Amino acid sequence: LRSIAQNITFIAVMRAILTMDATGTAAAAHTVSAQMFQLGLIAVLALSTLASILIPQRLNSSMSGPDGGVFEAKKVADRLLVWGFLLGCFLGCLQSCMLPLLPFFTPLQGVQEMARLPVLIGAVQMPLNGLVFVCEGLMQGHQAFLRLAGGMFVSTTFMIGALKLWGNTVEGVWCCFFVFNISRLFFGLKHHLFDGPLAIKTLRAMSQ
């Protein structure tokens, strides 16, 4: 279900991009921006996978052991969120510094100029993506797949609405990803902080 929602989002984005102009410049600029963005996204995805592995590992450890149990899982999860944010900041700075490398991605001057601002917008979003992907990795570790899919469907709905309002330029489409990812982050943090297995109230109840 989560994959279906993601595919709907990508289809909506590509539809907005392809109908933007008849020359194909916008589509080419979006493709170049996405390629540069995905170079950093690989590292963030790796951290998400790590979160999905470490959390069940800690939860399945002995509650009485020094390294196991819910409280240790909470520490690991919080640490991963911090690392996700810091990694996102680093990757965002790195992507911003890669602007002079645009000619290596496309020789067309018009595409290079149109891709500059989307690349910078993507760089600004990297810290947000670091948090989002770690949160979703944590939810996968808790096997909260239905909630993850539900949050993704809601976020996709917001994204489609944002595209109708601001999706008439390449920069506008990339700004719409803020709406998409902030919604995903809301559902991820809600699960982590308020109503998931590692929520603060849950840990307080266990410690009493």
What are these model-predicted stretches?
Residues 18, 27-98, 132-143, 147:
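Small-residue-rich hydrophobic transmembrane alpha-helices
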Residues 24-27, 145, 170-173:
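Membrane-helix interface/capping residues of multi-pass secondary transporters
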Residues 55-125, 162-208:
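Short alpha-helical transmembrane segments in multi-pass integral membrane proteins
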Residues 45-48, 121-141, 147-159, 172-192:
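Short runs within selected transmembrane alpha-helices of multi-pass transporters and secretion channels
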Residues 1-12, 39-43, 47, 119, ...:
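Hydrophobic faces of transmembrane alpha-helices in multi-pass small-molecule transporters and flippases
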Residues 5-17, 51, 98-102:
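Hydrophobic/aromatic end-of-helix segments at the C-terminal termini of transmembrane alpha-helices
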Residues 11, 15-16, 39, 100, ...:
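Alpha-helical transmembrane segments of multipass membrane proteins
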Residues 1-3, 13, 18-19, 23-30:
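Acidic, glycine-rich loop-and-beta core segments that form the ion-binding/anion-interacting portion
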